[in-house]
Amino acid sequence: MKGLILVGGYGTRLRPLTLTVPKPLVEFCNRPMILHQIEALAAAGVTDIVLAVNYRPEVMVETLKKYEKQYGVSITFSVETEPLGTAGPLKLAEKVLKKDNSPFFVLNSDVICEYPFKELAAFHRAHGGKGTIVATKVDEPSKYGVIVHDIATPNLIDRFVEKPVEFVGNRINAGLYILNPEVIDLIELRPTSIEKETFPILVEQKSLYSFDLEGYWMDVGQPKDFLAGTVLYLNSLSKRHPEQLAKGDNIVGNVIIDPSAKISGSAKLGPDVVIGPNVTIGEGVRITRSVVLSDSTINDHSLVKSTIVGWHSTVGKWCRLEGCSVLGDDVEVKDEVYVNGGKVLPHKSISANVPKEAIIM
C-alpha cells in the first residue's frame, strides 16, 4: 500500500521552532512529528510513502533515509514549485499513488492520534465507495466544517456544513483519508483543495464515507495545540504503554524523560511534561505541562509551565516561564526573568521581563 503525507510549507504557525528545524522533524514527545506517522503507516503494511513538500526537502533527506531502512519503506519527496493546496499534491504524485491500482492513504502532517490505518483500510474495502474520511467528534462543532450523513445509508456522507450556526452534527474531518486511485482523475495539477473541490464531487457521486476515530485527536501545528496534544498523547500512553512513562518521587502524573537527561532529585516534574535528550534540570525546579527539547538547561528554582523550551536553550535561576511561551533554538533567559506568552527567536538572550504576549526578535 501507499501513503501521502501533506507536509506543505514553512510551518509558520509553529515558529520560532520551525525557523531552525523543518516542522516534520520537530520532536513531538521526543520523536520527530513525522516519525509517529511513518511508523503507523509502516505497521499497517504501507511500503511507499510520499512526502508532499514545498520547501527544504534537503534538510529532511538524511533523517528520512535512516527511517527507510528502519521501517522497510520507500520514502520519496514530491516537491511543489508552487504551493498546490491539499489536492494538487495528489496529482503531482500520481505516478507513485497509481502504481498498483490499490487505495492509498492521505494524511495531514500536523495530526496526532491513534492512527487507525488497518481498520480504515478494511472499512473502506467493505463499503465499496471511492473515498473514506476519518471523522473525529468535537465539543464545539460551530468552529469547524461538519460532516452530515445520509439518513438511509450508514456512514455515507450527504454534505459538509461549514461552521454551522445550528447543530447539524459533531463530527469533523480529522485530516486522514483513504482514496481509490481514480479519485486522482478528478484533480487538476494546480493549487486546489481536496476538502472544497474534490470531496464535494465524491459526495455528489454518493461515494464518500466517514470512519469514526476512537480516542484522542489533535492538530498540533501551533504551540497551544502542540502542548494540548502532548497532554492527550501522554494520557493515551499511560493506558497503552505505561512502562514508557517516568516513575519517581519527584514525578507527578504523566511524564516522559529521555534516559540521557540529568535531573536534580529536588526538582519536581509533571503532570504532562516531556524532557528531551541531554537536558539538565537544576535544584528546586518545577515544570508542568511543558516540553523541554534536547540539550537545554533549566537552572535552579525556576518555574516552567505551559511552555516549549527549544533546543540548546538555557533558562537562568529563579525564572518563571508560562502562558504558552516558546523559546527558539539557542535562547538564553537570564536569572530572575519572567516570561508570559513570549515567543523568543533563535540565538536571543533576554534579561528583561516579558509580561505579556510578544515576539522577541
From Swiss-Prot:
It comes from the Eukaryota. Gene3D superfamilies: Hexapeptide repeat proteins, Spore Coat Polysaccharide Biosynthesis Protein SpsA, Chain A. GO terms for biological process: cell wall mannoprotein biosynthetic process; GDP-mannose biosynthetic process; protein glycosylation. SUPFAM superfamilies: Nucleotide-diphospho-sugar transferases (SSF53448). The keyword NADP does not apply. It catalyses: alpha-D-mannose 1-phosphate + GTP + H(+) = GDP-alpha-D-mannose + diphosphate. It is found in: Cytoplasm. GO terms for molecular function: GTP binding; mannose-1-phosphate guanylyltransferase (GTP) activity. Keywords: Cell cycle, Cytoplasm, GTP-binding, Nucleotide-binding, Nucleotidyltransferase, Transferase. Pathway: Nucleotide-sugar biosynthesis; GDP-alpha-D-mannose biosynthesis; GDP-alpha-D-mannose from alpha-D-mannose 1-phosphate (GTP route): step 1/1. This is Mannose-1-phosphate guanyltransferase.
